[in-house]
Amino acid sequence: LVLDEPTAGLDPEERIRFRGIISDLSQQKLVLLSTHIVSDLEAVANEIILLRKGVVLEMQKPASLLEQLNGQVWLVTVPAADETALTKQYTCSNVMHTDGKSVIRLLSESAPRPDAVPTAPNMEDLYLYYFGR
């Protein structure tokens, strides 16, 4: 069964329900799910194939793919005024603003700053690692 973006446009409740259906179907059939909604992959995928222009980049279990990024995802807390310089220099997967500071989640092979804290990679980080800038 091939499903192309099956949860696009669904509200969160329907997305959860539909992912349950996909999971049930996968017990009896091979289900290929094409999506950029990484939360869908986290919820139902036993194995992930990353494709770029028809070429297989990776084909592994989600945990194995995420392990590749260990030590390459960092949290950095900086004054909000310094945010732009970091997000231009590194691939950024998230920014949270609090009390005049920016907590930035960055992808980098080494610590982007001495005060950077390593954090566990997630599927969005994985997506950006392979398909981001």
Predicted segment positions?
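Helix N-cap at the start of a conserved alpha-helix in ABC-type nucleotide-binding domains
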Residues: P12-E14
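ABC transporter nucleotide-binding domain
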Residues: F18-L106
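Catalytic Walker B motif of ABC-type/P-loop ATPase nucleotide-binding domains
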Residues: L1-E5, L10
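Short, flexible active-site loop motifs that bind/organize anionic cofactors or intermediates
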Residues: E5, Q28, V55, R113-A116
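C-terminal coupling/interaction segments
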Residues: N94-R133
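Short, Lys/Arg-enriched charge-dense amphipathic segments
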Residues: L1-V2, L75-T77, T84-Q89, D115-Y127
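Residue-level recognition of hydrophobic positions within alpha-helical transmembrane segments
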Residues: L10, H36-V38, A120-P121
